[in-house]
Amino acid sequence: MTSTYTRFDTVFLFSRFAGAKYSPLLPSPSFTLSTSGIHIRTKPNSRFHSIIASSSSSSVVAGTDSIEIKSLPTKPIEGQKTGTSGLRKKVKVFMEDNYLANWIQALFNSLPLEDYKNATLVLGGDGRYFNKEASQIIIKIAAGNGVGQILVGKEGILSTPAVSAVIRKRKANGGFIMSASHNPGGPEYDWGIKFNYSSGQPAPETITDKIYGNTLSISEIKVAEIPDIDLSQVGVTKYGNFSVEVIDPVSDYLELMEDVFDFDLIRGLLSRSDFGFMFDAMHAVTGAYAKPIFVDNLGAKPDSISNGVPLEDFGHGHPDPNLTYAKDLVDVMYRDNGPDFGAASDGDGDRNMVLGNKFFVTPSDSVAIIAANAQEAIPYFRAGPKGLARSMPTSGALDRVAEKLKLPFFEVPTGWKFFGNLMDAGKLSICGEESFGTGSDHIREKDGIWAVLAWLSILAHRNKDTKPGDKLVSVADVVKEYWATYGRNFFSRYDYEECESEGANKMIEYLREILSKSKAGDVYGNYVLQFADDFSYTDPVDGSVASKQGVRFVFTDGSRIIFRLSGTGSAGATVRIYIEQFEPDVSKHDVDAQIALKPLIDLALSVSKLKDFTGREKPTVIT
C-alpha cells in the first residue's frame, strides 16, 4: 500500500483553503491535525482500497502490522460545554481548527481506561453534512487512544435508536452518535456529537462534566497514522490490533424489531386494500430504514414512503416531525381520501409524529395509548409492562393508565437518561416525552420507528377480525375510546425558537421570583393555585438530584402551566410554554385544543410577560 506523507508548518484536523467553500460534490478533503513540524499521514482525493463489489457482502482488508501513533499538541477551545444530548453547534464551528478533535480526545481523557482500551465502540449518525468527514477524524483518534475495534454504519449512517441497539446486541463498550437531532443540517446549519454508554444510553452528567473540564485543559491529541476508511462498502479493515468494521445500518435494528413486534400481524394490516399507510422520513436517517422495514418486510407499497432518501441537508427541510415542519405529510393526511395512518420521524430517527385521517395524535396521548394497549397488541409486553414514566412537561394522560393498570409510575425531568436509569433497574418498560419522543426498554433511547410499529400493532390487533368491506377501527376511534375511558388531557406547547438568551433567562428569573411569593389558594383569573415550584427530581436508583427543571404552576382543577428553556438548539434559546387541562366530560372531548386551552394560554402569556422579555409576538411552532 502506498502511503502519502505531507509536511505542514501549521495544519488543522479539518482544514479549508482560505475563503474556499466545501461542496459535497467536490473531492473529500484530507484530514490532518493541528501541530507544527510533524509528518502526518493524509488521504488525498482517491479511494485507498478497492475492496468490495457488493455492499451486501463482507470482506477483510489487511493494513500494516502495526500503526504509528502521534501525540499532537493542541490548545483548549472555548464553547465545548457538553450536556446529555452531547455538543451541538453550527457545523462551521466544528469544522474550525481542532474543534471536533479536541472534544473527542477530551472524551477519551474522561473515560476509565477499561471503557475504551482494546474495546469495541460503535460509530454512526443521521447522514447530515460533515458526518463522513467527522467519521474519519473520530476513527483515527479512537485508534490513537487504543480502541480495539470500531463498528461504523455504512456511509456513516446509523439512527440513534440503531446505535443503542447495536451497542446492546454486540456488547460494545459505547458509541458515538453524530447528530443534531431534529435541528436543520447543511453548510449553514447544525452539527452535533454525543457518546452513549455500554447500556446504550447517553453518558451521564458525571462523564459529560468531565468532558467539558478536559476541554479546558487539553494539550495533546493522540492520532493514529492510518488512511481514511472506505465507508461505502460493508467489510472489515485491519491495522495491527485495530480494526474498523463497516456494518449494514439496518440489520441489527430490524432483527430487534422482529423480536419486539408481531410482523405477521402488522403485515396483515398493511396488505389490506382498504388501509392506507404513509411514512415521511423527512430526507433524514429513517429513510435508510423505511423501505427495508415497511416495504420489504411488512409489505407496504413503495410509494407509501415519502422523502425517503437521506440527504446531507435534509432536502433543505427542518427534520422535526410536528404539524409545522412535516406539513407535506399533514396536507396528505387531511385530504378527504387521505391515508388511514401516517407518521413521520426526525433527523436521527428517535422522534415520531402519528396521524390518522384528519386526526392528530398528541405525543402525550400517544404514549398513554401505547401503554394501555401494549399487553394485548405487542408480544414484547405479553407479561405486562414493569412500569410507566413520562417527562414532567408531558401531560398526565399516562398517569391515569398507570393508576388503572396498577403499575409503578415515575415523573422525571426532560432527558432520556432519566428513563434509562429506571430501565436498567428493572422499574420501567414504556415511557415518553411531549416532544415527540416515545420508547421502551428494548433500547435506551427514544425510538421513532418503534412508536410507528407500536401504533400499527394496535391498529392491526383491533382490526384482525374486521372483514373486507366493514369499517376499520381508525386512529381516531382508538384515541376517542381512550378518552372515554380515561378522560382527555387537552395539551399544547408553544415554542419560541432562537430567542435572545439574555431576555429568555431574565423571563425565567422573573417567574422564579413569582414562585418565591406564591402560595396555595392564590387566584389567577378563574384558576386557583394548588402549588407552584421549580421542578426538582431525586433519582430513585442512584439518588442523584436534578434541580431547576422547569417552572410550573399547578391549579386545583389539575390544569398546569409550565415554562422551560431548551438547550437542544445551536444558537440562542428556545422558550417553551406547556399548557394542560384535564376534561373528564365526554361531551367536551371534541373541542379544538386551542379553543379549550385559550384561557390558560392567555394566562401563561400574561403571567410570564413573554412579549416584554423576548419581543416575540407569536410562537414559532404550536403543537
Swiss-Prot record:
Any GO MF annotation of the entry: phosphoglucomutase activity
Cofactor remark: Binds 1 Mg(2+) ion per subunit.
EC class: isomerase
Cofactor section: Mg(2+)
PROSITE patterns, sorted: PGM_PMM
Transit peptide feature, positions: 1-63
CDD domains: PGM1 (cd03085)
InterPro entries: A-D-PHexomutase_a/b/a-I (IPR005844), A-D-PHexomutase_a/b/a-I/II/III (IPR016055), A-D-PHexomutase_a/b/a-II (IPR005845), A-D-PHexomutase_a/b/a-III (IPR005846), A-D-PHexomutase_C_sf (IPR036900), A-D-PHexomutase_CS (IPR016066), Alpha-D-phosphohexomutase_SF (IPR005841), PGM (IPR045244)
Keyword Coiled coil: no
Keyword field: Carbohydrate metabolism, Chloroplast, Glucose metabolism, Isomerase, Magnesium, Metal-binding, Phosphoprotein, Plastid, Transit peptide
Membrane-spanning segments: none
Location of this chain's protein in the cell: Plastid, Chloroplast
EC annotation from Swiss-Prot or TrEMBL: 5.4.2.2
Binding site for alpha-D-glucose 1,6-bisphosphate: 88, 181, 350-351, 414, 433, 435, 446
Function summary: Catalyzes the reversible isomerization of alpha-D-glucose 1-phosphate to alpha-D-glucose 6-phosphate. The mechanism proceeds via the intermediate compound alpha-D-glucose 1,6-bisphosphate. This enzyme participates in both the breakdown and synthesis of glucose. Factor that affects seed oil content. Accumulated starch in young embryos may play an important role in providing carbon resources for seed storage lipid biosynthesis in oilseed plants.
Name of the featured protein: Phosphoglucomutase, chloroplastic
Naturally occurring in which organism (per UniProt): Arabidopsis thaliana
Taxonomic classification: Eukaryota, Viridiplantae, Streptophyta, Embryophyta, Tracheophyta
